[in-house]
Amino acid sequence: VGGLDIAGLTGFYLGAAACGLPIVLDGVISCTAALAAVRLCPLVADYLIAAHCSEEPASALLLQELGKKAFLTAGMHLGEGTGAAAGIALLDLALAPYKEMPTFDEIGVEAYKPLK
């Protein structure tokens, strides 16, 4: 059972993976489409990021079948991409030091010298 929304997302995921773009999953519909895409092309799984596991029982089953573990579990079942939005914000927060901190060279820290 499914609709054109799942078919459309499946095609979108296949295209995103073909272009080397990450795919952030959110909820049962997006995970169902992801599973369909993985069944068509197993390499798609390498591009999937499970933002959260919703309260819907099917969510955990789909993530298990995809071999993915969500990094955010907050008991959410709001819909409309809220889990993915929260997940992306958390990823941005985690990447901020990597992207914004200067290197040792940029701040004049000398290279490590072993003690003798």
Regions found by a protein language model. Give the residues of each.
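N-terminal loops that bind phosphate or other acidic moieties
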Residues: 1-116
